[in-house]
């Protein structure tokens, strides 16, 4: 109990560093998001113009683990952040715990322009990416086309080393699709022990060819670039840089998992009204959405965004119509509820082999 208390206090103290710089300002919103390219783009494209027009300052708080800090702030009653990034699965667990504000969509999207996928009760969709099959086109046998998960599982037609993410999440969905389950039915199937076993049995078929279980987002691209593996799952935004370096890799969008990221307002946020203003400003504007997508190819959902982008960039995006229609939407709520149960089964399965 004492260790838990210290951990909570440490998390709140870390979050408080962002607040201390903004504390003296009368109108300020503390926004927690990842840093790097995305954080810099948010500052330049959304934060600074918003402050110039409204007089409301945005104080960024960079974090790699928003869930732990949201939890700490809520359990201690010391809510420092106003807005935080939430992932496709953690948004459900945080909302169920009562840590997030249920959004008033009339303040963010009064004209109902945003698509349903961007309008979560507890978060506005800010970006999207896909986990897909990525292939070395020079390793595909002559006269053949690898275009589905069934092909990925076809070791006779498409021999060679493969790589998958070291997690049950999305691997089980891909396995069931390869086994003939319609994408719209995979979560119904995985909700049963029989469905999980079916997915693992399917994975057994290709297990000898999974030479690397990747654990970081850049790893499968490095494996593909070096030729250590021929086919792998990977996140779409990391593929284009390899293509620009003339590495012969290609995304297979068919059967990909589309994943949405969100911005949420914390329960008890000190600057709730100004937070709503910023969410509307940044995420319900096509021009700003297009500029953010040019900086990082994980598009948001503001109507008209796609048309403002160059055609060659459009076709690289998961929400480009031709790409979107062949994917399924990742169900974060399912994994928020079922990961502990399925992870135990997965861990036992992984211990049996490579």
Language-model features: locations:
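Bacterial N-terminal signal peptides that target proteins for export
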Residues: 1-9
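Mature extracytoplasmic/periplasmic domains
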Residues: 261, 266-330
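A ligand-binding cleft/hinge motif common to bilobed small-molecule-binding domains
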Residues: 91-93, 225, 231-248
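Periplasmic-binding protein-like
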Residues: 113, 129, 197-206, 243-269
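Conserved C-terminal helix/tail region of periplasmic/extracytoplasmic solute-binding proteins
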Residues: 322-354
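Early extracytoplasmic/lumenal segment of secretory-pathway proteins
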Residues: 25-94
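Sec/Tat signal peptide C-region and signal peptidase I cleavage site
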Residues: 18-24
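Extracytoplasmic ligand-binding site segments that recognize negatively charged/polar headgroups
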Residues: 33-43, 79-81, 85-223
């Amino acid at each position: 109990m004492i260790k838990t208390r210290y951990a909570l206090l440490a998390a709140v103290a870390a979050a408080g560093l962002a607040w201390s710089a903004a504390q003296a300002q009368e109108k300020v919103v503390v926004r927690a998001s990842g840093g790097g390219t995305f954080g810099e783009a948010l500052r330049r494209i959304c934060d600074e113009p918003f402050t110039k027009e409204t007089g409301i300052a945005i104080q960024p708080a960079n974090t790699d683990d928003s869930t732990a800090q949201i939890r700490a702030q809520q359990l201690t009653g010391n809510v420092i952040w106003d807005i935080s990034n939430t992932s496709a699965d953690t948004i459900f667990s945080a909302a169920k715990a009562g840590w997030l504000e249920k959004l008033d969509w009339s303040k963010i999207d009064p004209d109902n322009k945003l698509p349903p996928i961007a309008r979560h009760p507890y978060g506005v969709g800010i970006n999207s990416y896909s986990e897909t099959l990525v292939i070395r086109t020079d390793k595909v046998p002559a006269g053949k086309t690898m275009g589905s998960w069934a092909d990925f599982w076809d070791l006779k037609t498409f021999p060679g080393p493969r790589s998958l993410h070291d997690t049950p999440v999305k691997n089980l969905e891909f396995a069931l699709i390869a086994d003939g389950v319609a994408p719209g039915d995979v979560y119904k199937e995985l909700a049963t022990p029989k469905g999980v076993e079916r997915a693992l049995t399917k994975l057994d078929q290709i297990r000898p060819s999974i030479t690397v279980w990747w654990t970081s987002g850049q790893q499968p691209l490095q494996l593909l670039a070096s030729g250590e593996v021929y086919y792998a799952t990977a996140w779409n935004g990391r593929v284009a840089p390899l293509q620009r370096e003339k590495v012969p890799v290609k995304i297979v969008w068919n059967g990909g998992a589309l994943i949405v990221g969100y911005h949420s307002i914390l329960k008890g946020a000190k600057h709730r009204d100004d937070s709503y203003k910023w969410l509307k400003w940044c995420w319900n504007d096509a021009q700003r959405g297009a500029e953010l997508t040019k900086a990082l190819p994980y598009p948001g959902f503001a109507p008209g965004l796609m048309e403002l982008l160059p055609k060659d960039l459009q076709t690289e995006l998961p929400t480009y119509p031709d790409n979107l229609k062949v994917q399924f939407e990742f169900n974060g709520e399912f994994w928020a509820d079922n990961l502990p149960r399925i992870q135990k089964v997965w861990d036992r399965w992984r211990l049996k082999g490579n």
